[in-house]
Regions:
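Bacterial N-terminal signal peptides that target proteins for export
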Residues: 5-25
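Surface-exposed amphipathic alpha-helical segments
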Residues: 221-250
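Post-signal peptide N-terminal segment of mature Sec-exported envelope proteins
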Residues: 46-71
């Protein structure tokens, strides 16, 4: 979501109904090819001394985002869920993931883009991603764990963003409103509901969690009303964070 996953057709977030989905969901959940994570090291220029820390503290072990696959059994009973191993994203992955359509959308108020896609879940070249895709007659849901190549600290949401509109392209048009995100100790969480004008289309939900300044989780998609999609995806976020926190790489 070292194996390259190519999808010949993107699953429809509206489960085949007429109507436009919001490109955000495709941007993060579908169409991206997810390979091992490389690491980089800073090089000290010749002739200069590396700065010395008063006390050397070992860095905490990075979270193993491949553990996101543990939630494959937490989807509704009639969903078919498939885990996709971790892969490092290149520019072609991001260009092919429909993120460009969302990036070019008009966000009103303009300062509210970070409410819809917090910076820590906005994929960049070098981001490592792993995920689970769950599909069924009653919906499509995507769970993606991300590890950024550089630290991205969560920032407070801007004011005046309780309701947001997206426009500018058929793939990225609709309204966005904040919804309650689950409280997880030591973790920053967000939640939004995304709606399009088509009354036949179910709303989409997007929940995010920042475990630290490099590791994050996104749960997104839509489901039939009888499944209580807001509760369902909120619970999936909690379970996803728990799965990743359960064991760290040595």
């Amino acid at each position: 979501m070292v194996v390259v996953i190519e999808m010949s057709a993107k699953p429809r977030l509206d489960r085949g109904r007429a109507g436009n989905g919001l490109a955000l969901l495709a941007a993060l959940g579908v169409g991206a090819t997810l390979a091992g994570c490389g690491s980089s090291a800073e090089v000290t220029p010749a002739g200069s001394a590396a700065p010395q820390s008063p006390v050397a503290q070992p860095s905490p072990a990075p979270y193993d985002i491949s553990r996101i696959g543990a939630v494959v059994d937490d989807f509704p009973q009639d969903f078919t869920a498939q885990a996709h191993p971790a892969k490092t994203l290149g520019q072609s992955d991001i260009d092919g993931s429909a993120v460009a359509a969302f990036t070019n959308a008009v966000v009103d108020p303009p300062q509210c883009r970070s409410v819809v896609i917090p910076p820590y879940v906005d994929p960049k070249v070098g981001t490592e991603a792993a995920g689970v895709i769950g599909q069924g007659d009653q919906g499509n849901m995507y769970v993606v764990a991300l590890r950024s190549p550089e630290p991205i600290a969560p920032a407070p949401d801007p004011a005046g963003c309780d309701r947001i509109s997206l426009s500018g392209s058929p793939e990225a048009s609709g309204s966005v409103e904040r919804v309650a995100a689950p409280a997880i100790a030591g973790v920053t969480t967000t939640g939004v509901k995304l709606s399009v004008a088509d009354p036949e289309a179910d709303p989409d939900y997007l929940y995010t969690a920042a475990l630290d300044d490099r590791t994050s989780v996104v749960v997104m998609g839509s489901a039939a009303e009888e499944l209580d999609p807001q509760r369902l995806m909120s619970d999936l976020l909690v379970k996803s964070v728990s799965a990743i926190q359960g064991q760290q790489q040595p």
